[in-house]
Amino acid sequence: MKTDIEIAREAKLEKITKIAEKIDISEEYVEPYGKYIAKVDLKIWEKVKNNKDGKLILVTAMTPTPAGEGKTTTSIGLSMALNRLGKKSIVTLREPSLGPVFGIKGGAAGGGYSQVLPMENINLHFTGDIHAVSAAHNLISAVIDAHIKFGNELGIDPTRIYWKRTIDMNDRALRNIVVGLGGSANGQPREDGFIITAASEIMAILCLAKDLKDLKERLSNIVVAQSYDKKLIKVKDLKIEGALAVLLKDAIKPNLVQTIENTPAFVHGGPFANIAHGTNSIIATKLALKLSDYVVTEAGFAADLGAEKFLDFVSPTAGYDVNAVVVVATIKALKYHGGVKKDELDNENVEAMLKGMENLRVHVENLKKYNVPVIVALNVFGSDTQRELDEFSKNCEIPHALVYAFEKGGEGAVDLANLVLENIKESQYKPLITSEMSLEEKIETLAKEIYRAGNVIYTDKAKSKLKFLRKHGYDTLPVIVAKTQSSISDDPKKINAPSGYTFTIRDFELSAGAGFIVALAGDIMRMPGLSKIPNAVNIDIDEEGNIIGLS
């Protein structure tokens, strides 16, 4: 089979104005970035806000292998299939981060014959949204250090600066650094560090903001440091929320692109699901709901991460109703959770596959607690044997369909689309976590009901931070748990369906502007590192300007 980039290059793209017409976006609201990409002017909301909402389909997955299980490919395929069946459907996705593109996971524009295009642009610099987030984030850092150098009127304690710098790259060497070296002209020396842009609070804010006014308000409330007299320093104290909003004025507008079958797609925003809330912008999804019958959206990593955060935090924040959830599974991931080593996953092993189905069962059981219909999509790979596929179908008690979107595009997801249409209903969804719960109750509920832990413990550092949050009145905010994506638990080595273990909260981080608290479990880091042989070694460009190796 041809590579993703070869398939993408052969696709016949339609002008973005034509794609916009298909979902009733008139030309006055289309801001083209070349022939095939456009921003959509936020003024369109006044025109469509009274339209009836379409139905929202959330795509998630079982606990993945390191390479991922094809959620994006399945999401795109499902939306294309719904369009093939005469339904008006839009897929809404996150923007790829350059870190994973050049790291182990590769791009995030789908794969095979189920892609959003133009994939080279989407996977690389796209419309500059992520760079705008980086610029806004680093402006805060620059202003903090300049403020300290020129008199420090706010009394910022350099040892209590919470705001690290950012870059959209996997670079472990930048996790902990010292800035301000080289003499007083370069500022005051202090410890600092970098996080990846997808983990920036500004990325979360961009994806949660409802409009420019809300964006500016959220930016102003970011807590960046503490003063010598223990007061919290916010962006509004630095008087730069206006400048930050200016840097983000175009980034807040949704990006319209197309699938390989010329159906519409919004690709906007890119917070990670293991260290943030893990789904595309509220603005893009709300707009898509007003413009189509069915919106297919994806939440990062497995159902214990992206889907939980979508159902407990994003949907209540945005006011979404969720009408169905699709859980992507693969024979490879099932075998992996059944104990098969990574280099043996292509070998037939029905026994291990059946054992690994416990992981899928737990995720489905968890999702049903939200009172939503759950459908399983088995993303079929060429290495899957007929016996494995037959045994999966025989033993999967949940409505399920085999998906061949990678090989066949929308045609390969028609069975899934029909199954979704059969099971979808008017939303009766309700979150598991409520605002009335205390912070500890929220964490304990997630730990026991979703992560299947027996109990929760807090390190001394976490207990101290909890007191800090209470003192400043932030303990009532929603909680986002940052943990490994490789296990339902807080330990990446605990595969399949661990239960009854101790779940440890080691620290808390405040995202006051975004409007949530991050509870850190395990050794999760906000700045990834590259692997020994990163995807970067496979990427090249020929003399004619054709990119090679991007996927």
Swiss-Prot record:
Q: Which Enzyme Commission number(s) are on file for it?
A: 6.3.4.3
Q: Where does ATP bind?
A: T65, P66, A67, G68, E69, G70, K71, T72
Molecular function in Gene Ontology:
ATP binding; formate-tetrahydrofolate ligase activity
Q: What is this protein called?
A: Formate--tetrahydrofolate ligase
| NCBIfam families the UniProt entry points to | PRK13505.1 (NF010030)
Q: Which UniProt keywords apply?
A: ATP-binding, Ligase, Nucleotide-binding, One-carbon metabolism
Question: Tell me, what is an example of a GO biological process annotation in this record?
Answer: tetrahydrofolate interconversion
UniProt organism field? Thermosipho africanus (strain TCF52B)
**Which pathway does the UniProt entry assign to this protein?**
One-carbon metabolism; tetrahydrofolate interconversion
Q: Kindly state which reaction or reactions the protein catalyses.
A: (6S)-5,6,7,8-tetrahydrofolate + formate + ATP = (6R)-10-formyltetrahydrofolate + ADP + phosphate
InterPro entries, from UniProt?
A: Formate_THF_ligase, Formate_THF_ligase_CS, P-loop_NTPase
